[in-house]
Amino acid sequence: MSYWSVSDIRTHLRALGANPKHEHRVLRLWSQALPQTQGRRPLESFMPAAVREALPGIEAQLQALATLREQHPGEDGSARLLVGLQDGQSVESVLLPRDGLCVSTQVGCAVGCVFCMTGQGGLVRQVESAEIVAQVALARHRRPVKKVVFMGMGEPAHNLDNVLEAIDLLGTVGNIGHK
């Protein structure tokens, strides 16, 4: 199964017998870049067998949502990350000084602002909610991320449903405060 949205992940977990607490745990560990085996209690004590057995595959699918293709460090402590998506498209995320991350919400852009290179090729597609969260998880494998800004490739307001779903997850189980 390929995940695109956070809702897809929840639906798949429910189909395996997960309840909201199980979903919460899987999504929390993924969005915080922690292994699915981490936790105070052993999985056997509370996670349904079907979910436990599927976890390695689920974890692999979640990690495949966003992969690092290139990293370019900046002199100011920032780092540009070229992020590969499942379908072969790429977006950029930028690790910012002081625990921030700038994420992309579209592959390309339809606006075409004269100062921005992103719009020159036009809009290719929307970045799905799970792919937005995956950019955060990928960055957290490199260093702590406590703040997220939606100022990368694309116009967040033109992809509002996916952006809001990602914000909801990051602001709850993702341990990033809403401001």
Where are these regions (language model features)?
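Conserved Radical SAM active-site core
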Residues: 89-91, 96, 101-107, 111-179
